[in-house]
């Protein structure tokens, strides 16, 4: 018998009986700000303003205005849960994904009869078609520009179909058949394809796939140079599952869709057409972004003309709170893999592990664990930090620690800054570098002298490693190891 294909429902079946990882509620919730407001207290975490915490994924079964739709949020809002869903140690997920990138399993196309994503089909030509009534996209806060698709995997291809790619973008529902999509300039392959179509003044066919195996979602967030132009990140998910991701031909567009997605929106990125992101609200805000602040509404988003909405029977709408721990998992773990790949190529064996903690939203900060064999390795840790900035341009802060420090425990990491760090010796500041435009401190008015354009930044390296010739003076207190210590709690 063939193995059951991986999809969101198979993953949920594996975790649904664990109350630490999954909870359902039948209490009615309004998708307009209330749903995200509720989950903020239960399990959002990340850079969300306190009070918040790490908690279970939540399935909301009674969504106001959408009687036939369930909404899932927080599925990846725990690194331990991601490890459980990937059947792998959460502490070495970066290494695991690095191996997956190097050994991709290409997706395969199946017949429509084998694609549950096409169980139910609505076309834009149908009477009364309105994506705002078909797709239960939540609004994160009352200030949002509108309902957002926050974890939709966009599938697109080059004009000659020789290359295809998947990426995740924020997309706001603007009208009955219109989405605004933010494609950050530079680095995104979907953006390169869209530019190609726009120069030819042709609409670009795409599909937006929602409600997926988290292996697909997390794999889709890899960026260059780890996944170069022409690398389809669905191969990463295939490697994680040792099973090809299944695709199906679109119903109304000449493009592939993910065959086991809960929802698929088909349509076209329209050439030379733009829309004001907050055209329906005029709040000046988009939605909460990973640094923990509301993003500014973009005055000129690219436009997606929707031609169809398809979904599974009893479909699950999946959503992510922008600054939550879920984003940390989605962006941070692939970034760890990217850093490990580049650093190990240049200085093999010297960086034992990497962690992008919630404080940086998965993008802005990394903690690197360093191994020194002898005095010739002194200084190699700072070269590793510089390589990390090369691997991921949006990285802002690197903290270097020794192997006796738990990089997943921020108290242990901060301890190194208090006992293994002198600011006048162990601090590196790198000015005038490129970073992420969503960091509000990277605006010219913050520092007109050094920040000429938005998205420029000074980067920081904190070297909390012990000088090799002083290792014996920094040995931590060694307590007795007691194998059966847990019996004292019974």
Swiss-Prot record:
Induction: By gallic acid. InterPro entries: UbiD, UbiD-like_C, UbiD-like_N, UbiD_Rift_dom. The keyword Cell cycle does not apply. Its cofactor is prenylated FMN; Mn(2+). Binds 1 prenylated FMN per subunit. One of its GO terms (molecular function) is metal ion binding. This is Gallate decarboxylase.
């Amino acid at each position: 018998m063939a193995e059951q294909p991986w999809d969101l429902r198979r993953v949920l079946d594996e975790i649904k009986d664990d109350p630490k990882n999954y909870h359902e509620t039948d209490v009615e919730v309004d998708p307009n700000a209330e749903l995200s407001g509720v989950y903020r207290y239960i399990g959002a975490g990340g850079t969300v303003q306190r009070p918040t915490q790490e908690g279970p994924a939540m399935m909301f079964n009674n969504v106001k205005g959408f009687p036939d739709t369930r909404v899932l949020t927080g599925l990846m809002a725990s690194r331990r849960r991601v490890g459980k869903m990937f059947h792998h140690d959460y502490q070495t997920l970066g290494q695991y994904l690095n191996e997956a990138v190097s050994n991709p399993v290409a997706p395969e196309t199946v017949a429509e009869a084998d694609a549950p994503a096409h169980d139910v089909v609505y076309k834009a030509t149908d009477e009364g078609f309105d994506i705002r009534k078909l797709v239960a996209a939540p609004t994160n806060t009352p200030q949002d520009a509108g309902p957002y698709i926050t974890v939709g995997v966009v599938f697109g291809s080059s004009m000659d179909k020789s290359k295809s790619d998947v990426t995740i973008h924020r997309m706001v529902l603007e009208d009955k058949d219109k989405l605004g999509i933010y494609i950050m300039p530079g680095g995104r392959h979907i953006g390169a394809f869209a530019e190609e179509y726009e120069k030819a003044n042709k609409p670009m066919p795409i599909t937006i796939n929602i409600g997926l195996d988290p292996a697909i979602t997390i794999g889709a967030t890899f960026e260059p140079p780890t996944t170069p132009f022409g690398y389809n990140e669905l191969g990463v998910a295939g490697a994680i599952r040792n099973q090809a991701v299944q695709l199906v031909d679109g119903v109304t567009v000449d493009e592939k869709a993910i065959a086991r997605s809960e929802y698929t929106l088909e349509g076209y990125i329209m050439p030379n057409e733009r829309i004001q992101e907050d055209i329906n609200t005029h709040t000046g805000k988009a939605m909460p972004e990973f640094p923990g602040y509301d993003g500014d509404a973009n005055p000129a988003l690219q436009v997606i003309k929707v031609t169809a909405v398809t979904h599974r029977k009893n479909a699950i709408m999946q959503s992510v709170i922008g600054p939550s721990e879920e984003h940390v998992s989605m962006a941070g773990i692939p970034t760890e893999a990217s850093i490990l790949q580049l650093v190990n190529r240049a200085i093999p064996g010297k960086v034992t592990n990497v962690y992008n903690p919630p404080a940086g939203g998965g993008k802005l900060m990394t903690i690197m664990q360093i191994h020194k064999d002898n005095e010739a390795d002194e200084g190699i840790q700072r070269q590793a930090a510089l390589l990390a900035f090369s691997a991921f341009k949006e990285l802002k802060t690197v903290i270097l620690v020794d192997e006796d420090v738990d990089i997943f425990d921020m108290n242990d990491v901060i301890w190194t800054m208090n006992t293994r760090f002198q600011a006048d010796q162990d601090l590196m500041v790198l000015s005038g570098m490129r970073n992420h435009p969503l960091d509000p401190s990277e605006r010219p008015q913050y520092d007109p002298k050094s920040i000429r354009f938005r998205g420029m930044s000074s980067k920081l390296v904190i070297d909390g490693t012990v000088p090799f010739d002083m290792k014996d003076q920094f040995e931590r207190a060694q307590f007795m190891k007691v194998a059966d210590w847990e019996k004292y709690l019974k």
